[in-house]
Amino acid sequence: MTLEFSGLGLAPEFVDYQHAWDVQRELHGKVVAGEAPSTVLLLEHAAVYTAGKLTEDHERPFDGTPVVAVDRGGKLTWHGPGQLIAYPILKLKNRAGIRDYVERLEAVMIAVMADYGIRAERIKGRAGVWVKADANGPDRKIAAIGIRVLNGVTMHGVAINCSNDLAPYGQIIACGITDAGVTTMSRETGKDIRPADIAERFVEEFRKHEEALVSSPEGALL
């Protein structure tokens, strides 16, 4: 196998965002240089707001809470306990296949949620994974995606809402979306689902896409 998975910390060990960002950048440089294999980092963050490159001033926390600016795509979001974070640092087999990469990330998360009876899906024009409007509420986001590809190697990744508190989203315009809500796997099922509960299934589903996504150590990027 050319893909590895590394756990940086799950509850009760929450990972500081800056530390995870430093690990990402160091690992990214090694993968670009061929000094480390493509690796997916799995973790839970300590609570933090992060702002992607498209974030506008009016979307920032209403109470003035500090925000970490990052170089991923997308807008403002929150990370914290109860969210499974996955940062794939992958040498892409097809450098032009960014849309395919995003769709595969979505497919992994949709498959994991299906195990719990959650009908998660894509919604045209909206990033991430969603539960469509029903008797329980409007369209609601259950997982976010924000990535960057530099020198053919991916950074940043996905956040799956498992059991996290939704109150922090009330202080921001999450991902720039004003006409939809946010939810968690626990809220949709009525069960307590933690990041540690789904991490192994996430790995299993991700491995199904390894051959299509990841360049072998000996292979040149297309």
Curated annotation (Swiss-Prot):
This is Octanoyltransferase. It comes from Pseudarthrobacter chlorophenolicus (strain ATCC 700700 / DSM 12829 / CIP 107037 / JCM 12360 / KCTC 9906 / NCIMB 13794 / A6) (Arthrobacter chlorophenolicus). NCBIfam families: lipB (TIGR00214), PRK14345.1 (NF010925). In the reaction, the free carboxyl group of octanoic acid is attached via an amide linkage to the epsilon-amino group of a specific lysine residue of lipoyl domains of lipoate-dependent enzymes. Residues 34-214 form the BPL/LPL catalytic domain. It is an enzyme of class 2 (transferase). GO terms for biological process: protein modification process. The lineage of its organism: Bacteria, Bacillati, Actinomycetota, Actinomycetes, Micrococcales. It is found in: Cytoplasm.
